[in-house]
Regions:
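Conserved beta-strand-loop-alpha-helix junction that forms the acyl-donor binding cleft
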Residues: 115-125, 144-147
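Terminal substrate-recognition subdomain of acyl/acetyltransferases
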Residues: 2-3, 141-147
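Active-site acidic-Proline motif in GNAT/NAT acetyltransferases
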Residues: 86-88, 92, 120-121
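Conserved GNAT acetyl-CoA-binding A-motif
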Residues: 106-117
Length: 147
């Protein structure tokens, strides 16, 4: 991980409903698709959603989105839904800073554990998640349903 001055100039910041204007400039590949204003407003307005941005010179260069899952029979947990850093700034410590920030926010909101999944062939993501010191769980099957 080659941290450099560009990465040091990046601000890591949790965002909420009042921060929608920050999404006016988003670097390539930070999100999987275009940010839609109505979906962004709904996401940021949900009390169990957490989003942390990496900002450089007013541009979103990274993000992590997470959801708090509340259970009637188990401790609350944080699901890391999406992590993205623009390719020009990857492998410079920004992803780790985003994950550290979202973990801290999850802890502060009562979560006792966090979990994340990624594709087996996504080696950069797997390397990052491994460096964060998880307990690797056994493989599971995921199912997707169109509603």
């Amino acid at each position: 991980m080659a941290e450099d001055r560009d990465a040091e100039a990046v601000e890591i910041r949790a965002v909420g409903p009042a921060d929608r204007a920050l999404f006016a400039r988003v670097a390539p590949e930070v999100f999987d698709g275009a940010v839609m204003p109505e979906r962004l407003a709904a996401y940021l307005g949900s009390k169990d959603h957490i989003m942390v941005l990496a900002l450089r010179d007013g541009e979103v260069v990274g993000q992590v989105a997470a959801v708090i899952h509340r259970h009637p029979d188990m401790p609350d947990e944080l699901y890391i839904d999406n992590l993205g850093v623009t390719p020009a700034l990857q492998r410079r410590g920004i992803g780790r800073r985003l994950m550290d920030a979202v973990f801290a926010l999850g802890r502060a909101r009562g979560c006792e554990e966090a979990w994340v999944a990624t594709e087996f062939d996504n080696r950069p993501a797997r390397a990052l998640y491994t460096r964060l010191g998880p307990v690797e769980d056994e493989p599971v099957a995921f199912y997707l349903y169109e509603l």
